[in-house]
């Protein structure tokens, strides 16, 4: 299946503990069908100090991945979640918003 959400897209979370939050996609994990969204689904990770790498130990908050079905791309024209489709323009495959037909 083609990936409808890509890095740097603005998305909104549709389900889960962070439902309604918006953020920018930092990374797309294609093999797992998951995305990492900036400031959403934060988890606390306990890290050991590593003097060789210059890493101090402690508790670090970082973003965990969210399944791609639980996020939707935000249409900048409406500011709301929207569905995305594909079509060909000038022999190039482009993404468009299903509500108004504008290109992503």
Curated annotation (Swiss-Prot):
The gene is rplX. It comes from the Bacteria. One of its GO terms (biological process) is translation. One of two assembly initiator proteins, it binds directly to the 5'-end of the 23S rRNA, where it nucleates assembly of the 50S subunit. One of the proteins that surrounds the polypeptide exit tunnel on the outside of the subunit. GO terms for cellular component: ribonucleoprotein complex; ribosome. SMART domains: KOW (SM00739). Part of the 50S ribosomal subunit. This is Large ribosomal subunit protein uL24. GO terms for molecular function: rRNA binding; structural constituent of ribosome. It holds the Pfam family KOW. Keywords: Ribonucleoprotein, Ribosomal protein, RNA-binding, rRNA-binding. It comes from Alteromonas mediterranea (strain DSM 17117 / CIP 110805 / LMG 28347 / Deep ecotype). The lineage of its organism: Bacteria, Pseudomonadati, Pseudomonadota, Gammaproteobacteria, Alteromonadales. Belongs to the universal ribosomal protein uL24 family.
